[in-house]
Amino acid sequence: MAALQYLESLKNTHPELGEWYNSLADLYQKKLWHQLTLKLEQFIALAVFQAGDALIQFYHNFITDFETKINLLKLAHFAVVVSRQYSEKEAAVSYLESVIEKLRATKEPRITEPIIYIETQKALFKLEQGDQKECKKILDDGKSSLDSMTDIDPSVYANFYWVSSQYHKCRQEFSDFYKSALLYLAYTSVEDLSESFKLDLAFDLSLSALLGENIYNFGELLAHPILKSLLGTNVEWLYHILQAFNHGDLVQYQELCRVHNASLIAQPALVENEKKLLEKINILCLIEIIFSRPAEDRTIPLSIIAERTKLSIEDVEHLLMKSLSVHLIEGIIDQVNGTIYVSWAQPRVLGIPQIKALRDQLDSWVDKVHTTLLSVEAETPDLVAA
């Protein structure tokens, strides 16, 4: 058989992999497709296949012989890995389209998942070719299909959100990139990612969090293990800036900007959006003021906000109106008395320092309740006894 002859020829070319080829041949002859699939997953990850067109040849000379007999989503995984070895994007797209046609020809009930997985990779190739319109069309079609399905394999979601994030990154749509990248991580094991990949993604996520419209909650990102990739590198400053934003710490932010001025200037997006960044940290400073006050003290003098943010009263009013407009807070500004009554603030993910502050507030509340109870017991013993 041609497939076995091909394995034999590979054994002669790479005698050090003889055991692998013998194992693959044995499983193939016994038609143990599931076990063969698991072996192939390990095999194609070997270093010898990571350069040139070795995987392309392996696919066409061996895997094609039984491709529709194995799990079709696993076939899609193999096809995507193989497609990345094509030097020409157009050839890679044509190859993926041929695999999709084979999937459709099987008429299996669950072919939508593997097709979406492959189509998503096609979208990435289109994006790399500069065809944003076609990339967007493929992603929109994929999203519609995913929304109508249930029990979807995490790898399909991960691939979809990764390509979506790259589309938004290409267009400098920071908020959409941030959402897509976080969703990608939700369906991906961080331990399986390379250190360089984690560092690049952590950097991009951090920038998009700072620059994205209506992103005012950094707790979820800071709690994610991927952010630790920034520590001990030459971009660790970005992690500390995120911490400053999360705490609404204007003083720390300004100090970090001073110390890391050269690194900040090297990031054009940060330079271009300097005013927006200052507005955002001022808003977060306001949120920190609100959360740090006792629950019964909801009326805040504008002078306190002005002192913390180093803004004029007029600029504080603009800051409050911005916060109200993006629905970070609800309340009423009293210009006559120079105060704002805050009736609601958007919930947020709390860090350890914020949780400790909340604990202190709860302890204070418990003490007040206990004092009140003692007072009631002392003044109305008969009522309490009853």
From Swiss-Prot:
Ubiquitous with highest expression in flowers. Keywords: Acetylation, Proteasome. One of its GO terms (cellular component) is proteasome complex. Acts as a regulatory subunit of the 26S proteasome which is involved in the ATP-dependent degradation of ubiquitinated proteins. Belongs to the proteasome subunit S11 family. It comes from Arabidopsis thaliana (Mouse-ear cress). It holds the Pfam family PCI. This is 26S proteasome non-ATPase regulatory subunit 13 homolog A. The modification N-acetylalanine is found at residue 2. Component of the 19S regulatory particle (RP/PA700) lid subcomplex of the 26S proteasome. The 26S proteasome is composed of a core protease (CP), known as the 20S proteasome, capped at one or both ends by the 19S regulatory particle (RP/PA700). The RP/PA700 complex is composed of at least 17 different subunits in two subcomplexes, the base and the lid, which form the portions proximal and distal to the 20S proteolytic core, respectively. Residues 173-347 form the PCI domain.
